[in-house]
């Protein structure tokens, strides 16, 4: 592949004079480029929706969501995965991020790791990948060997696969069952795909993980009702969520949360249904943790 022919590696005619601009004009130029990102992502929404449904299916079948990438792409996957346990109360590892070169590559590049196709497969073997898992490969260029190797192994195992890249008709898009390719155009700084490409990938990951968790019963209305209240800020947020969902007073919300060990979902059900904590938990269990279903049935 001629790397210079990739959109993500080409020069941007709107930013040829970066080194001659005033500071304000410099940041304005970057901002102008960033406005293109959401529009590019919008064009991929049908594929993003398919990825959300695939992620939901994986979770409901007892599988995991696995992100894998190199460099910025890998770091973004690790970031999104690491936010899921505190936000949605899911176990660590249910959403997992793999980066070429291992955890050390989060802080310092591991030379050659992204060019090792077998390493992608080996990393998935090491986490005992199963056919129930969803594997999402991230590569701005769309041709990272580490990601291709991982996607090919996952495909052989029977996993549903997703590719997220910022070049059209990329190699990883051709390997994966679902291809999400927001074409954001040349970067403001030539080839620096941590910029628009990274932003586009983050927007897509936001939708995949959050959308899947909504459809997995971790959200009521637009409230993260399975959030873990692990610090003062989150304890306060838990109380506010109960108030917002029920219309109860803060005192009533605090009393309910005290009985549920600050577990928001049963506290809401207690107030709206008149159940005690044990009965609220039992009813939630009977409805697979879906608060709306527990309230309506």
UniProtKB/Swiss-Prot annotation:
GO MF term set: carbohydrate derivative binding; carbon-oxygen lyase activity; ether hydrolase activity
InterPro entries found in the cross-reference section? Etherase_MurQ, Glucokinase_regulatory_CS, MURQ/GCKR, SIS_dom, SIS_dom_sf, UBA-like_sf
Classification via PANTHER family: GLUCOKINASE REGULATORY PROTEIN, N-ACETYLMURAMIC ACID 6-PHOSPHATE ETHERASE
Catalysed transformations (reactions) = N-acetyl-D-muramate 6-phosphate + H2O = N-acetyl-D-glucosamine 6-phosphate + (R)-lactate
**What Gene3D superfamilies does this protein map onto?**
1.10.8.1080, Glucose-6-phosphate isomerase like protein, domain 1 (3.40.50.10490)
Q: What is this protein called?
A: N-acetylmuramic acid 6-phosphate etherase
Keyword Lipoprotein set for record: no
Q: Domain SIS spans what residues?
A: 55-218
What family does the Swiss-Prot or TrEMBL record give for this protein? Belongs to the GCKR-like family. MurNAc-6-P etherase subfamily.
What other note does the entry give for this protein? A lyase-type mechanism (elimination/hydration) is suggested for the cleavage of the lactyl ether bond of MurNAc 6-phosphate, with the formation of an alpha,beta-unsaturated aldehyde intermediate with (E)-stereochemistry, followed by the syn addition of water to give product.
Query: What is the species listed in this Swiss-Prot or TrEMBL entry?
Result: Enterobacter sp. (strain 638)
**Assembly notes:** Homodimer.
Reply yes or no: does the keyword Transmembrane helix apply: no
Would you say which domain of life the source belongs to? Bacteria
Documented EC number(s): 4.2.1.126
């Amino acid at each position: 592949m001629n790397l210079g022919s990739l959109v993500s590696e080409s020069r941007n005619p709107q930013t040829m004079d970066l080194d001659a601009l005033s500071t304000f004009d410099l940041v304005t130029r970057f901002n102008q480029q960033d406005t293109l990102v959401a529009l590019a992502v919008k064009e991929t929404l049908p594929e993003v929706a398919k990825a959300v449904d695939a992620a939901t299916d994986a979770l409901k079948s007892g599988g995991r969501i696995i992100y894998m990438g190199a460099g910025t792409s890998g770091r973004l996957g690790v970031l999104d995965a690491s936010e899921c346990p505190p936000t949605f109360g899911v176990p660590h590892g249910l959403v997992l991020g793999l980066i070429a070169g291992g955890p050390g590559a989060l802080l310092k590049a591991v030379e050659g790791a992204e060019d090792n196709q077998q390493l992608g497969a080996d990393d998935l073997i090491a986490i005992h990948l199963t056919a129930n898992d969803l594997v999402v490969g991230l590569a701005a260029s769309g041709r990272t060997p580490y990601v291709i190797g991982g996607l090919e192994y996952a495909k052989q195992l029977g996993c549903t696969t997703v590719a997220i890249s910022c070049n059209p008709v990329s190699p990883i898009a051709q390997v994966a069952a679902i291809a999400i390719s927001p074409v954001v155009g040349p970067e403001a700084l030539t080839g620096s795909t941590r910029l628009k490409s990274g932003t586009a990938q983050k927007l897509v990951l936001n939708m995949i993980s959050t959308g899947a968790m909504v459809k997995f019963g971790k959200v009521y209305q637009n409230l993260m009702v399975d959030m873990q209240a692990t610090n003062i800020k989150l304890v306060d947020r838990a109380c506010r969520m109960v108030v917002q969902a029920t219309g109860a007073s803060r005192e009533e919300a605090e009393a309910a949360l005290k009985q549920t060990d600050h577990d928001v979902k049963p506290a809401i059900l207690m107030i709206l249904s008149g159940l005690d904590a044990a009965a609220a938990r039992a009813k939630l269990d009977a409805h697979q943790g879906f608060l709306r279903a527990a309230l309506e049935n």
